A protein has these predicted regions:
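Intrinsically disordered, low-complexity linkers and terminal regions
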Residues: 1-75, 79-161
Length: 161
């Protein structure tokens, strides 16, 4: 009898824990449709998810947005996430990628940015974007940093770190 009561109480506790941890708020957004202007969109903190990692975007620093030719905009909480996602796309040259610049605090075209590899980023990859060249800090071009991401040369790699 005690085993049955214990099992019922344990089951009720587990069910209560599952119900209390459910996300019953508004659904999170990882893709917005209809951005035919191909400009970066305003992000509401806590409402948008990184399309690659599934984490909530709570800060603009190190974020990125990728706009597809059809106007679909994908959001990323780490610059390396957009690069890894971009490598899997068939139409890379038609996708407009925006990265958040740490020096001017606005979105800039990813191909025009300078990059650093030693930043503190949400996913720990270490890539930071800058609008202006800062000698000794932001010394990498777009193609160089995409190649680093493709090779796994990030701060998560113990041989790089």
């Amino acid at each position: 009898m005690i085993k049955k009561i214990f099992a019922a109480v344990l089951l009720a506790c587990v069910m209560g824990l599952l119900i209390s941890s459910m996300d019953i708020a508004e659904s999170k957004i990882s893709v917005r449709h209809g951005n035919t202007d191909k400009q970066p969109l305003q992000i509401e903190f806590g409402k948008y998810l990184c399309h690659e990692s599934g984490t909530v975007i709570n800060d603009l620093y190190n974020t990125a947005q990728a706009v597809m030719p059809n106007g679909d905009t994908y959001f990323f909480n780490d610059i390396a996430n957009v690069f890894m996602w971009l490598m899997r796309q068939k139409n890379k040259d038609e996708i407009v990628v925006w990265v958040y610049s740490q020096d001017t605090e606005k979105y800039i075209i990813a191909k025009d940015a300078w990059y650093s590899r030693v930043e503190i980023t949400p996913m720990g990859y270490g890539f930071g974007a800058y609008e202006f060249h800062n000698y000794g800090r932001s010394d990498y071009y777009y193609d160089e940093i995409v190649l680093c991401a493709a090779r796994g040369e990030t701060l998560l790699n113990p041989l790089i770190n």
